[in-house]
A protein has these predicted regions:
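Gly/Ala-rich beta-loop-alpha elbow adjacent to hydrolase catalytic centers
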Residues: 93, 97, 101
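Post-His helix in hydrolase/transferase enzymes
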Residues: 245-257
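Conserved alpha/beta-hydrolase catalytic His-Asp/Glu region
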Residues: 117, 127-128, 143-203
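Conserved loop-alpha-helix segment in the C-terminal half of the alpha/beta-hydrolase fold
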Residues: 41-43, 200, 205-239, 245
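Active-site loop/oxyanion-hole signature of alpha/beta-hydrolase fold enzymes
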Residues: 51-92, 253
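Flexible "cap/lid" loop of the alpha/beta hydrolase fold
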Residues: 102-107, 113-144
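Conserved HGGG/HGGXW glycine-rich cap/lid loop of the alpha/beta-hydrolase fold
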Residues: 10-60
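N-terminal cap/lid segment of alpha/beta-hydrolase-fold proteins
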Residues: 1-13
Length: 260
């Protein structure tokens, strides 16, 4: 896969990890951004033409000051689809990216093919409150997000040696920039009343969850299914919240079966 750049009419300029051929699939990342190693996207690009844009405020993407609320994020998603020259692509999103993809599908229900949501944010159950990721340290994030925290720590830091002060500084600055952007739609809780809009969703929908997810527990999968009649739910063993990175082959098999 290779990096390209997409510029939207609103003025955002976003890096896009692109590769593969065939049916277009646009993948929206979560609050942590795209990690250095992306076996899920690499594998998906063996079957589809994959576009994985970075949100403004992530990596070298610019224009974060232009996005202020959930509607801005959803419209930005469609602006990116237009900038990429795509017509009715499949949309997929992980965590925060799943929340945005679902909002996009409610906003323009006939403008996408199918919808894939991997451990999406966006709903709230009082009996299962979602932990505040903005109050956690990096090592705490790994314990919360990954089935294997040690491996997760290496993935989150890109293998950087955080005992090196410069590496630690660079990691924290990047993390703060990413979380400042994510906080616009996730803080103080990741609930922007999406449940009231899901009735508009017309696309066939697949919901995928990690059985060991400790951030957004699998009980949320049942709530999504209740709000999206006909939605298919798959729960993957050996994965927590970061299932695209923990079980890439398994999630690709499930997606390929669903997308065709």
């Amino acid at each position: 896969m290779k990096w390209t750049v997409a510029e939207t009419r609103k003025g955002t300029r976003c890096r896009v990890l692109e590769g593969g051929s065939g049916t277009p699939v646009v993948f929206f990342h979560g609050a942590g951004g795209l990690l250095r190693d992306n076996p899920f996207l690499d594998g998906l690009a063996q079957r589809y033409h994959v576009y994985a844009p970075e949100w403004p405020g992530y990596g070298d993407s610019a224009g974060d000051e232009l996005l202020e609320d959930m509607l801005d994020f959803a419209l930005h998603g469609w602006d990116l689809v237009d900038a990429l020259g795509l017509s009715r692509p499949h949309l997929a999103g992980h965590s925060m990216g799943g929340m945005i993809a679902a909002e996009m599908a409610c906003l323009a229900p006939r403008d996408l093919g199918k919808l894939v949501l991997a451990s999406p944010a966006g709903l709230w159950l009082d009996e299962h409150p979602i932990p505040d990721i903005f109050a956690l340290l990096p090592y705490q994030l790994a314990e919360l997000l990954f089935h294997d925290p040690a491996r997760g720590q290496a993935l989150l830091t890109g293998g950087a040696d955080l005992s090196d002060l410069e590496a630690l500084k660079e990691f924290y600055l990047g993390s703060q920039r990413r979380l400042a952007m994510a906080g616009k739609i996730l803080f103080p809780i990741p609930n922007r009343r999406l449940s009231k809009r899901l009735y508009r969703l017309a696309a066939e929908t697949l919901i995928v969850w990690g059985a060991a997810d400790r951030l957004i527990v699998p009980a949320y999968a049942a709530r999504w299914k209740a709000l999206i009649p006909g939605a298919r739910v798959e729960v993957l063993d050996g994965a927590a919240h970061m299932l695209p990175w923990e079980q890439p082959e398994a999630i690709i098999r499930v997606l390929a079966d669903f997308l065709g």
